[in-house]
Amino acid sequence: MVKKTIAAIFSVLVLSTVLTACNTTRGVGEDISDGGNAISGAATKAQQ
C-alpha cells in the first residue's frame, strides 16, 4: 500500500514537471520543432 502511494505521488510529480516545462501539449510540439530546426541549422553550417 505504501509503495503504491509513493509510486503515485512520484508519477504525479514527474508528470507535472514535464507539463510545466513545456507549458502545454502545444508547447511540446514547438519544443521538438525548435530542436529539429537547431539540428538542421547545425548540419547546414557543417556542410558549408
From Swiss-Prot:
Lipid linkage positions (S-diacylglycerol cysteine): C22
Signal peptide as annotated in the record: 1-21
Localization terms from the record: Cell membrane
Pfam families: Entericidin
PROSITE patterns in UniProt: PROKAR_LIPOPROTEIN
Lipidation (N-palmitoyl cysteine): C22
Annotated Gene Ontology cellular component terms: membrane; plasma membrane
UniProt entry tagged with the keyword Oxidoreductase: no
A single BP term in Gene Ontology: response to toxic substance
Record membrane topology: Lipid-anchor
Keyword Lipoprotein belongs to the record: yes
Keywords, alphabetical: Cell membrane, Lipoprotein, Membrane, Palmitate, Signal
Listed InterPro entries: Entericidin
Its biological purpose: Plays a role in the bacteriolysis. Is activated under conditions of high osmolarity by the factor sigma S. Entericidin A functions as an antidote.
Homology family: Belongs to the EcnA/EcnB lipoprotein family.
NCBIfam families with a match to the protein in the record: PRK10081.1 (NF007487)
Protein name: Entericidin B
Lineage: Bacteria, Pseudomonadati, Pseudomonadota, Gammaproteobacteria, Enterobacterales
Encoding gene, per UniProt annotation: ecnB
